């Protein structure tokens, strides 16, 4: 919305006196900063009202697994669906500060809200039925896959460059794997995988939101560089015109995430729920596909990959041998069973996320 101010200054001569000031709205960096502040302020201002409303409507709050760590039973009654706070702040910040004519913004936002709706319905069933399982995992994955496939098809159609359906290999200069139209399926796998990996990570207060913000900040930088022809040429990365605007969307999420963390810090006043975790993971996946840095997402989001792999390994091992590799999965629960306190796990996982983000960003230069 604010992006139109510079257009008004060109259309109506009366705005000419303010043209120097309004010119700052041309800059993605300025609008990204504005989106950060807007997202944070929205959640700070409306967060308490949303939490009170959800607490009243949900009554008993999110069900707690009885087979999990006993310390989690103290969290009984905490409302869930906190992702609504994040998605609201994200949407407001994006609508106000992003270029409304940029298709990449709307595609990624559609994936985010679509995954958020799937997570919301899952949370709704858990709360109303007071069970730790929502609707069937197969149906949920099918809906997520449908959303992701449509989004990836749209992304490929936007960029007719043959490289748009190729996979770039980090660290290796000019090395790509050409997938053709199969890239649509691969991209959908990345988006769905990212959504569910973040969902599995969201098991402790503050555990998921900070790594998500770290990954988002990293991809804000990548999107800005990939969307700038000069920087992309200098770094020898794929130039994707228009994707720089995704930095504004990332900024809105950073601000909304900071606001949510205020209320999610231990002891949490609200849980993100599937509403937030699926949406944020799906958003990261969609941005990675849009800017052609899918493998880099696996590095920067390595913590999410670790959580997802721990569940897969646990399930496969138990089905094949009847034995479990970890005391409990996802892996953050394994460390709880080993005696680590919740703050120890959360902060150490944050540190790992920072190191992985630095490793992922290093791929931009090391080629």
Curated annotation (Swiss-Prot):
Keyword annotations of the record: Cell cycle, Cell division, Cell inner membrane, Cell membrane, Cell shape, Cell wall biogenesis/degradation, Magnesium, Membrane, Metal-binding, Peptidoglycan synthesis, Transferase, Transmembrane, Transmembrane helix
Keyword Nucleotide-binding (UniProt): no
EC code(s) of this entry: 2.7.8.13
Disulfide feature: none
Cofactor(s) demanded: Mg(2+)
GO molecular function, one term: UDP-N-acetylmuramoyl-L-alanyl-D-glutamyl-meso-2,6-diaminopimelyl-D-alanyl-D-alanine:undecaprenyl-phosphate transferase activity
Primary enzyme class: transferase
Entry's Gene Ontology cellular component terms: plasma membrane
Spans traversing the lipid bilayer: 34-54, 78-98, 101-121, 135-155, 175-195, 206-226, 246-266, 270-290, 295-315, 344-364
Domain of life of the native organism: Bacteria
Functional pathway: Cell wall biogenesis; peptidoglycan biosynthesis
Protein name listed in UniProt: Phospho-N-acetylmuramoyl-pentapeptide-transferase
Organism name: Bradyrhizobium diazoefficiens (strain JCM 10833 / BCRC 13528 / IAM 13628 / NBRC 14792 / USDA 110)
